[in-house]
Design a protein with these regions (language model features):
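Beta-strand-rich domains and repeat architectures in extracellular enzymes and scaffolds
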Residues: 46-71, 326-332, 347-349
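Asp-box/WD-like beta-propeller blade repeats and closely related beta-sheet repeat scaffolds
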Residues: 93-97, 102-113, 122-160, 168, ...
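Beta-rich catalytic cores
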Residues: 54, 75, 93, 103-106, ...
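Conserved beta-propeller blade signature
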Residues: 65-69, 116-119, 164-168, 240-244, ...
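Surface loop/turn motifs at the tips and blade-to-blade linkers of beta-strand repeat domains
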Residues: 48-52, 96-103, 142-149, 220-225, ...
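Hydrophobic core register within WD40 beta-propeller blades
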Residues: 58, 110, 157, 229-232, ...
Length: 424
């Protein structure tokens, strides 16, 4: 997840007028090239802000103010607030704020809930009461403290209608391997069974949104068997939690006798799940093959790339996206500005792959999935493309921009943050 500076692409229907900051109105003039993006007919894009620093998730207040969680590698403010004062869709005020302990490169969460701004560093979920001021001035409260220190430590945040907050504790490993067995040039791992990481990791926990100073033991585990979750949200139409998983890596590197380099590039799928308490979604024992459309036994657990998983209790995905695309945010569209088919549908920001070599990298898009009655009602499609700025991405460093976070504005506009350069 490399990033250098940050972008906000502001998307909205071409026939609409944008209304921001309460009573202030202004006609939006779309960028002539839609900010470098390729969009469906009838949509336009405006660049909102430039060079605010590498960003993660974003949130938009009811008056149009924008809040961004930054990826911090130095002693600098960890968030930034933006305000459009003349209704042209571009930020006129850019105000960094907040210094937090243990911020770090995987600081991620930024959401607004019941009058509070919630945001997360790598190990802490904070909140502050927000009012008419652009930058929160209220006391900062610790909602949740993570006492562990591990890989996959990002903490996205989601809320339901009953006063609960959801935070993932992702897996600290690739496949829950217990030891390494080296034979010649082949390095193979044996998986632990049962996997001890499933006790306190590889799942999503439910907490009270209004409680302070919680730790993991105050929460209730929802789903398990989820390797790494950054894209997670509630669908308000059915009050159900959904998540898109980062699948495992290194099938060819660790198991070259079972998987070719090409199989490694296209397997396993990034899986889109409906999250239910008590469900097991497969990691580390299985993975989903997007070619065969089946759950397969993981090689660390006696799989060979051909053995179908026989545990019927493991839940299949609603949709299987291409391998290694790195789903980093999920938004269910609630507005009325976009055409009716987008209502309650899912937008997913794919950050883009890093490990498909020797084949080109892929992803770097925002996808859309139509929904009806809480289930996908059609195939997924590319909504926004062109972030990478090049036709062939040999290495992740070739990509000019990488879509990262999603937020919906009060008028139904869609905001997209980029984790590299800060174009708007």
């Amino acid at each position: 997840m490399k990033s250098a500076i940050n972008n906000f692409i502001f998307l909205f229907c071409a026939c609409m007028i944008f209304i921001a900051c309460g009573t202030k109105k202004g006609n939006i003039v779309f960028d002539s090239n839609n900010g470098g993006l390729f969009l469906p007919d009838g949509f336009g894009a405006v660049v909102v802000v430039d060079s605010i620093g590498p960003s993660r998730h974003i949130a938009v207040k009811e008056n149009g103010d924008i809040y961004v969680k930054l990826k911090i590698t130095s002693d600098a403010p960890g968030s930034v607030a933006l305000r459009d004062e003349d209704g042209d869709g571009k930020a006129d005020i850019i105000q960094p704020f907040g210094k937090y302990v243990n911020d770090g490169i995987f600081a991620t969460g930024m959401r607004i809930h019941n009058g509070y701004l919630y945001y997360s560093t790598e190990k802490v979920v904070y909140r502050q009461k927000i009012d008419n001021d652009l930058v929160p001035i209220s006391k900062q409260e610790i909602v949740l403290m993570d006492e562990s220190d591990q890989w996959h430590i990002a903490k996205p945040i989601a809320f339901d209608k009953e006063g609960n907050m959801y935070v993932p504790y992702s897996a600290p490993s690739n496949a829950c391997a217990s030891f390494i067995n080296t034979t010649g040039t082949s390095v193979q791992q044996a998986g632990q069974y049962p996997c001890p990481e499933l006790v306190n990791h590889a799942g999503i926990w439910k907490f009270k949104a209004n409680a302070i100073n919680q730790t993991q033991k105050d929460g209730v585990q929802m789903g398990t068997g989820l390797r790494s979750i950054v894209a997670m949200n509630f669908n308000a139409s059915n009050n159900t939690l959904y998540a898109v998983q980062h699948g495992r890596d290194d099938l060819h590197l660790l198991w070259p006798n079972h998987y070719s380099a090409w199989q490694n590039a296209v397997t396993p799928a990034e899986e889109f799940f409906e999250i239910k308490e008590g469900n097991h979604y497969g990691w580390p024992y299985t993975y989903y093959d997007p070619i065969t459309r089946q759950k397969m036994q993981a090689p660390e657990y006696s799989g060979d790339g051909k053995t179908i998983a026989n545990d019927q209790s493991i839940v299949n995905p609603l949709i299987a996206f291409p391998a290694h695309w790195a789903p980093n945010d999920l938004l269910f569209y609630q507005g009325d500005q976009f055409p009716a088919r987008y209502k309650n549908g899912a937008f997913i920001a794919f950050h883009g792959s890093t490990n498909r070599g020797p084949y080109p990298q892929a992803g770097y898009i925002v996808a859309f999935v139509p929904f009806k009655n809480g289930k996908p009602s059609g195939t997924w499609e590319v909504f926004a493309d062109g972030f990478a700025g090049v036709d062939t991405i040999v290495n992740v460093s070739d990509a000019q921009f990488r879509p990262m976070g999603l937020a919906e504005g009060p008028d139904g506009s869609l905001y997209i943050s980029d984790s590299r350069k800060g174009k708007i």
